[in-house]
């Protein structure tokens, strides 16, 4: 039994590692595989949080210098303040909507059927967006107008549906609003 749990944990860790940095929902994939493996309940949820911490640490490591420059430049650097304001504006819609709808989201949307549909629709959206992307107008987060950051945050609200990738929703929304690919991925 213990070996089965280790194999389940290794498989879920592999799934997280393969999907976290792609514009697909790593959480959605974990929900589906949790169900398939019977790895549910509080221990399964704690495990998901722990393996996702690795991805967060990786992002912090890769972007540490840039984030540190923003933090230390908040007082004197207008670009750092603008960057921080853009991030805050982009975060607000999902925070407010997520707090308001948390119970409904957990009760209705956290199931493999919803996740599967969201993953399929996300793939279709990526394919369609490739044909609709306008020429880029925005190349630096430090120069994002406030309304653009807020609109990107509204796109992020789509990721409140399990199976919709947060990075996928924000990258696609950013691209469709004229942000270049690299900047969209960084934001």
Swiss-Prot record:
Membrane topology (UniProt): Multi-pass membrane protein
Annotated catalysed reactions: di-trans,octa-cis-undecaprenyl diphosphate + H2O = di-trans,octa-cis-undecaprenyl phosphate + phosphate + H(+)
Transmembrane segments: 13-33, 45-65, 85-105, 108-128
A GO molecular-function annotation: undecaprenyl-diphosphatase activity
Top-level taxonomic group: Bacteria
Enzyme Commission number: 3.6.1.27
Name this polypeptide is given: Undecaprenyl-diphosphatase
Gene Ontology CC entries for this record: plasma membrane
Remaining remarks: Bacitracin is thought to be involved in the inhibition of peptidoglycan synthesis by sequestering undecaprenyl diphosphate, thereby reducing the pool of lipid carrier available.
Signal peptide: none
Keyword Signal among record annotations: no
Cellular localisation: Cell inner membrane
Annotated source species: Azospirillum brasilense
Pfam hit, one: BacA
UniProt keyword Translocase, yes or no: no
Homology family: Belongs to the UppP family.
Biological process (GO), any one: regulation of cell shape
Keywords: Antibiotic resistance, Cell inner membrane, Cell membrane, Cell shape, Cell wall biogenesis/degradation, Hydrolase, Membrane, Peptidoglycan synthesis, Transmembrane, Transmembrane helix
């Amino acid at each position: 039994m213990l070996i089965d749990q280790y194999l389940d944990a290794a498989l879920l860790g592999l799934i997280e590692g393969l999907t976290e940095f792609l514009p697909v929902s790593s959480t959605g994939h974990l929900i589906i595989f949790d169900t398939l493996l019977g790895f549910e309940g509080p221990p399964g949820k704690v495990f998901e949080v722990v393996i996702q911490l690795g991805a967060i640490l990786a992002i912090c490591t890769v972007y540490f210098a840039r984030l540190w420059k923003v933090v230390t430049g908040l007082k004197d650097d207008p670009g750092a303040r603008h960057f921080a304001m853009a991030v805050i504006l982009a975060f607000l819609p999902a925070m407010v909507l997520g707090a308001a709808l948390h119970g409904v989201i957990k009760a209705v949307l956290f199931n493999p059927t919803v996740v599967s549909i969201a993953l399929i629709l996300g793939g279709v959206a990526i394919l369609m967006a490739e044909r609709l992307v306008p020429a880029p107008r925005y190349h630096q987060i430090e120069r994002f107008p406030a309304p653009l950051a807020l609109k990107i945050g509204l796109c992020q609200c789509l990721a409140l549906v399990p199976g919709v990738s947060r990075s996928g929703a924000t990258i696609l929304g950013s691209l469709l609003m004229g942000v270049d690919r690299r900047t969209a991925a960084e934001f």
